A protein has these predicted regions:
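Structural signal for well-ordered, non-membrane alpha-helices
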Residues: 97, 167-171, 226
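GST-like fold's C-terminal all-alpha helical module
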Residues: 102-213, 217
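Intrinsically disordered, low-complexity polar regions and short flexible loop motifs
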Residues: 218-224
């Protein structure tokens, strides 16, 4: 039975799962959505990307999907055999998904020039009939989400200062590397952070790119993981 990943790699969560599949060398197909209705069709539980067909089941949520992949193919493992390190890896994965993600969202949707670039990037692969709907609804809807989350209420200079502090903290957690918590193999934490750093380091968010470029250690980390999962 074919393993199918549903979602577009512009999403850091789809990228996270894509890299996990590549790391484990699991053959799969990728189906990209052609509009918002495909999201609900592919993932009726949450209506979000990614979703994955695996072993006869339709899975959702990047964290749950990676957990299932570790059971489906245990090697290479996505968690350290050392329980304290594994606990830290789980926490970092959750932080990247639930906190760092929103810095990228604010930079994309709360700065008008970036919003224009983001919509152009999203719409280029969508059917023409869907594009006006995305252009009309997405900016207002997503910007309201960032304000409800909290980061969207911050002045840009404060947001960038906080982002810089978090990136500096990531360098400390990377330690001697090559992967987070000085481990020799990538884990769920590395996959999650990689996805979010790529989300920040994008032509549509020059502020995010500049923030990440300050830390050569993070760029080198991304290059290492990319080489293992490309």
């Amino acid at each position: 039975m074919a393993i199918i990943l549903y979602g577009n790699r512009l999403s850091p969560f789809v990228e996270k799962v894509h890299r996990g599949l590549m790391l484990k060398q699991i053959p799969f197909q990728q189906h990209e959505p052609h509009g918002p209705f495909d999201l609900r069709r592919n993932n009726p539980t949450t209506g979000k990307m990614p979703a994955l067909d695996l072993d006869g089941q339709r899975l959702f949520d990047s964290t749950l999907i990676l957990r299932a992949l570790d059971e489906f193919k245990p090697e290479p493992p996505l968690l350290s055999p050392d329980p304290p390190i594994a606990a830290q890896q789980r926490l970092l994965e959750d932080w990247a998904d639930e906190s760092l993600y929103w810095y990228g969202m604010v930079l994309r949707w709360n700065i008008p020039a970036n919003t224009t670039r983001t919509i152009k990037l999203i719409c280029k692969d969508l059917p023409p009939v869907v594009r006006p709907l995305i252009k009309l609804m997405a900016p207002r809807f997503v910007a309201s989400q960032t304000r409800a989350q909290g980061l969207g209420r911050l002045p840009l200079n404060v947001l960038l200062q906080e982002l810089d502090r978090h990136l500096a903290n990531l360098v400390q957690l990377l330690g001697d590397g090559p992967f987070f918590f000085s481990t020799s193999q990538p884990s769920i934490a590395d996959l999650a952070v990689f996805g979010q750093l790529g989300f920040l380091y994008s032509p549509v968010t020059p502020e995010g790119t500049a923030a990440v470029e300050k830390y050569s250690e993070l760029l080198e980390f991304c290059q290492r993981l990319d080489a293992m999962t490309d």
